[in-house]
């Protein structure tokens, strides 16, 4: 499966992130549900990732935790998004 690359600013620095299109789609869906811009959501997740964890990995883990097995959005992530 091909990766999709996007460029955005995180913590004031320009970054390129590569994820599968399905992860980008879910991140966009989560951002809409939270009524936030996608860059804001990604910045929040990036700021709360574990030491040594890559940004792409943190984004994928966030999506997996946020979405239930049936594809419905959960309330998970409020701590990260509201911090």
Name each model-derived stretch.
Residues 54-80:
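C-terminal structural segments of small proteins and small subunits
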Residues 5, 9-63:
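Amphipathic, hydrophobic secondary-structure cores in small proteins
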């Amino acid at each position: 499966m091909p990766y999709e690359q996007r460029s955005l600013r995180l913590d004031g620095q320009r970054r390129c992130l590569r994820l599968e299109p399905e992860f980008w789609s879910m991140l966009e869906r989560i951002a809409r549900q939270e009524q936030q811009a996608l860059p804001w959501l990604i910045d929040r997740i990036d700021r709360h990732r574990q030491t040594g964890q890559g940004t792409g990995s943190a984004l994928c883990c966030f999506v997996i935790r946020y979405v239930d097995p049936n594809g419905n959005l959960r309330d998970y992530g409020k701590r990260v998004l509201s911090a």
